[in-house]
Amino acid sequence: MSSMQETIINAFNFRHATKEFDPEKKVSESDFHTILETGRLSPSSLGLEPWRFVVIENEDLKEKLKPYSWGAQKQLNTASRFVIILARKNVTADSEYVQHIIRGIKKYEESTIPAVEDKFNNFQTNFHINDNERTLLDWASKQTYIALANMMTSAALLGIDSCPMEGFDLDKVTEILAEENVVDTEHFAPSVMVAFGYRKEEPKDKVRQPAEDVIEWI
């Protein structure tokens, strides 16, 4: 095994879902910037980046979220950094957002845009993504998990612990974030939370199914 391969595998063995962090140990600005950049630079279906990363630093807001975030009880108060990843709603070919991406960011030639839109529409139809608002949001949320995984992996490579969390009351958390002007509910919904910091205690040994049970060669 090469040194790079060993570094990668060691990082994955190091990473675990940290339930409680050492509140005295802080993730540096430069390390956290790197973690956020790996999220921002992550791949997404059709390169549409249907996400937003909200860094929660306000302690009062954390306290408001806590009663409705049963999966983040210890993490909210002990993690050095706490992020809520939002998924974008109604990402369709004719939406203002997608038009911004294909015209303003990707800068497709005007003559090619109708073909791009047709391809996008066909893809969403074939996968039943555009069946309704819920299926559109579920698809966007899938993309946020790609960014989430990359952020946690980069953190592990930096020796930083993390914990992803779905354990929250979606409606109440959305309501609180909207009241605090953190999220525009017309365009976004909370997808997943993730905390970063340094473990308070050493975890139990990692347990996974053997490779032959989860990998199949055809």
Curated annotation (Swiss-Prot):
Needed cofactors: FMN
InterPro entries given in the database record: NfsB-like, Nitroreductase, Nitroreductase-like, Nitroreductase/BluB
Matches recorded under SUPFAM superfamilies: FMN-dependent nitroreductase-like
Sequence intervals crossing the membrane: none
Stated family: Belongs to the nitroreductase family.
Any Gene Ontology biological process: 2,4,6-trinitrotoluene catabolic process
Name of protein: Putative NAD(P)H nitroreductase SH0546
Organism: Staphylococcus haemolyticus (strain JCSC1435)
